Curated annotation (Swiss-Prot):
The lineage of its organism: Eukaryota, Viridiplantae, Streptophyta, Embryophyta, Tracheophyta. By light-reversible phosphorylation. Keywords: Allosteric enzyme, Carbon dioxide fixation, Cytoplasm, Lyase, Magnesium, Phosphoprotein, Photosynthesis. Pfam families: PEPcase. The active site is at 177, 606, 647. Pathway: Photosynthesis; C4 acid pathway. Its EC number is 4.1.1.31. Belongs to the PEPCase type 1 family. GO terms for biological process: carbon fixation; leaf development; photosynthesis; response to ammonium ion; response to cytokinin; response to nitrate; tricarboxylic acid cycle. This is Phosphoenolpyruvate carboxylase 1.
Length: 970
């Protein structure tokens, strides 16, 4: 390790690595290679930058880093002005290049951190229970350790653990929430950089390997840098679906059977000598991509139909490959009588069939290879399944009949189960438990649709349709009826037989869209879909309306209807709403003892602040679980968590283990949103860790529940939540000019230019904070590193508790030390403070906010500091993140990059918003764009921008860079 003394005033750093070593603390552990990894990547990049654009640009980028590092080390805000002066006079092409360079270096720092974490995992020196970011978390829930701990420490028998696992289901729901700001092209290049770096540090590497890997590393770094980071068009829902499904194809498909084998091994190690049955739904996958129409007019019935058919095509393709591998493997001739008879029937009925479109096994298979005969027939039906879906996708019709393809999972499983049983009967169970078992598990996990598509729609849209029907029938306006009358009418129609939807119903485009979606549900195979989720649900009639519309549109197997409670008031009334629903006899007959309820973390946090939302979510879950228990209903809670703490994010296993006791009971659904998909499933080892975390934490929560809060803790939380909500709303809702301040002090108005999702940023045009979606709301505050929605109200709540009774300070410390929910809430808040910087937020205020609003910004920054100090006192910490040196080290490494981008963003916003802002032009830096009279190619990438050349792209690059540095977007 280099000396840690500060550089002298005349000392010039020739490598960023030299400056890094002034900043970064010493090794955190013996296997700490973060600085080494980062220096290697950044030095390679700087050499590439110099080769492409000359030494002036390289030197400028290094100087920006050094000024930012000075600010980070000393907190001297004059350095921000110095940096701003350097950045504002850049020529348009140079500005884009500098922003792109810093963004790229930040991405490389993230990759170094990911490789370091994987290195520590391999060395089994993982720090347990840390609070690092989700994707690169050093946090863990190891399935084998969990099983052993449940037996040896908790006192459960191995059989009890086995039974619990057999009855457990974790359903991970991929959503297209627009928070993945990086393009897929760059994500793939980053993956190759990560792999090169990992292999370069392997112990058995030869000199030739090292040279070739080093060349590959430089090639990939340069390819990433030369790729446009900016999406030039908004993605369609179909494109989002393809993006999400690429993870299923690339890591999850093979990852699931690999993980389930590890579960088998873990069970064996606690004395269970049988495998987890293949028909156990330990892990399931669902999707909202192409089904979530809430506030997204681009998700039409046609889009929903397209993504379902596309998913069936993808699934059939994957299965065809697996079946062909299995045909090579199952070359045995011994089989039981049942399989022999089936094989002979299939062989005689196929004639001397030649299928030239197959590469392998294209001629008729002889009867002395019975398993291959059976599997060949399965492959034929899969081929037809794929081609039928392709035809329906292309033209809406297909000559291939449904009968000649697979239409149900049972039909697909039957011949595979026949092969499995036959192998076992003939003494070949070891062979049966190989690739065939893996395939059976894949079929049971993914079905014929790969993922089940959830449908989500806002309750008001259903009200519009029912209102149009009742008005057309001349029985009044459904919209104006009270809840009792709505329920009475809906139930009478549901109990009756008469058709309700008249063919001549006058329909607006919106009504036609809702009805069209139900017709798609009726048209496509039922196994394509998950539940039907109603956002902004408030009453039983919201659920019954969807039940009625499903019946009217001919949905053969109605989707389970799931109310989503997300605003604070809706969460408070959720238990009563669920109880009213369960008191309806017709509905209880319909659900057969099972109900799913979704709770939303994003809108509740935007509505009331993080502390109040977290506590209300906790209480709502507890109370709904009690209601379900009284009515004999198995309740599954669906957690709509985002990636950021402001939207319910945080390390997976900690989030699960801090849920109230008796609310999971072996069954949980969780959204995996935006950038979190890449963090959780971008690599095979990440996929494995993700499946392990969810499975182990869900099992542990059920078999070793967290403590219930003491009555005095509850009372104090109730009181603090009221104070926190009042404080939060006094600023966000009641402060007359808050919206003006928010839009001035953050890049909220420019957010839509990033093209990071198909969904509009607002539910309705115009309006204030209430119409703004939670993602751009959180995104904007994350960009300025102020994170206001996460901490606002918390300090006031703590202060109230301590001022009311000084003994409450000890109660709060006790809550932190003994209650997982409270500890996780505060530790995640501490992580946010570690990433925050009121000095940076102050720069945005200074440059962008009206003079008369600046005192308001100063008040907020004072509250930020006060809240942070109170938090540290309650947690018993002297410094931020003193208990997590790994995350602290990573932040020290990333922050100078982020600060440069923050300053660049603030000054770019100033130039965009204030045409009178004067800048002093600098001579060109890049040798590529030295001719000032020739427009640079970089600037021409965005010819439609309404701003002066280069400003919009520079702004977008800073947004992407800060999102990468925070390791969250929205």
């Amino acid at each position: 390790m280099a000396s840690t003394k500060a550089p002298g005033p005349g000392e010039k750093h020739h490598s960023i690595d030299a400056q890094l070593r002034q900043l970064v603390p010493g090794k955190v552990s013996e296997d700490d290679k973060l600085i080494e990894y980062d220096a290697l990547l950044v030095d390679r990049f700087l050499n590439i930058l110099q080769d492409l654009h000359g030494p002036s640009l390289r030197e400028f980028v290094q100087e920006c880093y050094e000024v930012s590092a000075d600010y980070e080390g000393k907190g001297d805000t004059t350095k921000l002005g110095e940096l701003g002066a350097k950045l504002t006079g850049l020529a348009p092409a140079d500005a884009i290049l500098v922003a792109s360079s810093i963004l790229h270096m930040l991405n490389l720092a993230n990759l170094a951190e990911e490789v370091q974490i994987a290195h520590r995992r391999r060395n089994s020196k993982l720090k347990k229970g840390g609070f690092a970011d989700e994707g690169s978390a050093t946090t863990e829930s190891d399935i084998e350790e969990t099983l052993k701990r449940l037996v040896s420490e908790v006192g459960k028998s191995p059989e009890e653990v086995f039974e619990a696992l057999k009855n457990q289901t974790v359903d991970l729901v991929f959503t297209a929430h627009p928070t993945q700001s990086a393009r897929r092209s760059l994500l793939q290049k980053n993956a190759r950089i990560r792999n090169c770096l990992t292999q370069l540090n392997a112990k058995d590497i030869t000199d030739d390997d090292k040279q070739e890997l080093d060349e590959a590393l430089q090639r990939e770094i340069q390819a990433a840098f030369r790729t446009d980071e900016i999406r030039r068009a908004q993605p369609t829902p179909q494109a989002e679906m393809r993006y999400g499904m690429s993870y299923i194809h690339e890591t999850v498909w093979k990852g699931v059977p690999k993980f389930l084998r590890r579960v088998d091994t873990a069970l064996k190690n606690i004395g269970i000598n049988e495998r987890l049955p293949y028909n156990v739904s330990l892990i399931r996958f669902s999707s909202w991509m192409g089904g979530d129409r809430d506030g997204n007019p681009r998700v039409t019935p046609e889009v929903t139909r397209d993504v379902c058919l596309l998913a069936r095509m993808m699934a059939a393709n994957l299965y065809i490959d697996q079946i062909e591998e299995l045909m090579f493997e199952l070359s045995m001739w011994r089989c039981n009588d049942e399989l022999r008879v089936r094989a002979e029937e299939l062989h005689s009925s196929s004639g001397s069939k030649v299928t030239k479109y197959y590469i392998e096994f294209w001629k008729q298979i002889p009867p002395n290879e019975p398993y291959r005969v059976i599997l060949g027939h399965v492959r034929d039906k899969l081929y037809n399944t794929r081609e039928r879906a392709r035809h329906l996708l292309a033209s809406g019709v297909s000559e291939i009949s449904a009968e000649s393809s697979f239409t149900s999972i049972e039909e697909f499983l039957e011949p595979l189960e026949l092969c499995y049983k036959s192998l076992c009967d003939c003494g070949d169970k070891a062979i049966a438990d190989g690739s065939l078992l893996d395939l059976l598990r894949q079929v049971f996990t993914f079905g014929l649709s790969l993922v089940k598509l959830d449908i989500r729609q806002e309750s008001e849209r259903h009200t519009d349709v029912i209102d149009a029907i009742t008005t057309h029938l001349g029985i009044g306006s459904y919209r104006e009826w009270p809840e009792d009358k709505r329920q009475e009418w809906l139930l009478s129609e549901l109990r009756g037989k008469r058709p309700l939807l008249p063919p001549d119903l006058p329909q607006t485009d919106e009504i036609a869209d809702v009805i069209g979606a139900f017709h798609v549900l009726a048209e496509l195979p039922p196994d394509s879909f998950g539940p039907y989720i109603i956002s902004m649900a408030t009453a039983p009639s919201d659920v019954l309306a969807v039940e009625l519309l499903q019946r009217e549109c001919g949905v053969r197997q109605p989707l389970p209807v799931v109310p989503l409670f997300e605003r604070l008031a809706d969460l408070q009334s959720a238990p009563a709403s669920v109880e009213r629903l369960f008191s309806v006899d017709w509905y209880m007959d319909r659900i057969k003892g099972k109900q799913q309820v979704m709770v939303g973390y994003s809108d509740s946090g935007k509505d009331a602040g993080r502390l109040s939302a977290a506590w209300q979510l906790y209480r709502a879950q507890e109370e709904m679980a009690q209601v379900a228990k009284r009515y004999g209903v198995k309740l599954t809670l669906f957690h709509g968590r985002g990636g950021t703490v402001g939207r319910g994010g945080g390390p997976t296993h900690l989030a699960i283990l801090s849920q109230p006791p008796d609310t999971i009971n072996g069954s949980i659904r969780v959204t995996v949103q935006g950038e979190v998909i890449e963090f959780c499933f971008g690599e095979e080892h990440l996929c494995f860790q993700t499946l392990q975390r969810f499975t182990a934490a869900t099992l542990e929560h059920g078999m070793h529940p967290p403590v219930s809060p003491k009555p005095e803790w509850r009372k104090l939380m109730d009181e603090m939540a009221v104070v926190a909500t009042e404080e939060y709303r006094s600023v966000v809702v009641k402060e007359a000019r808050f919206v003006e301040y928010f839009r001035s002090a953050t890049p909220e108005t420019e957010y839509g230019r990033m093209n990071i999702g198909s969904r509009p940023a607002k539910r309705r045009p115009g309006g204030g904070i209430t119409t703004l979606r939670a993602i751009p709301w959180i995104f904007s505050w994350t960009q300025t590193r102020f994170h206001l929605p996460v901490w606002l109200g918390v300090g006031a709540a703590f202060k109230f508790a301590i001022d009311k009774d000084v003994r409450n300070f000890q109660v709060l410390k006790e809550m932190y030390n003994e209650w997982p929910f409270f500890r996780v809430t505060l530790d995640l808040l501490e992580m946010v403070f570690a990433k925050g910087d009121p000095g940076i937020a102050g720069l945005y205020d200074e440059l962008l906010v009206a003079e008369e609003l600046k005192p308001f910004g100063k008040q907020l920054r004072d509250k930020y500091v006060e809240t942070q100090q109170l938090l540290l006192q309650i947690a018993g910490h002297k410094d931020i993140l003193e208990g997590d040196p790994f995350l602290k080290q990573g932040l020290v490494l990333r922050n100078p990059y982020i600060t440069t981008l923050n300053v660049f963003q603030a000054y770019t916003l100033k130039r965009i918003r204030d045409p009178n802002f004067k800048v002093t032009p600098q001579p060109p830096l890049s040798k590529e764009f030295a001719d000032e009279n020739k427009p640079a190619g970089l600037v021409k990438l965005n010819p439609a921008s309404e701003y002066p050349p280069g400003l919009e792209d520079t702004l977008i690059l800073t947004m992407k860079g800060i999102a990468a540095g925070m390791q969250n977007t929205g």
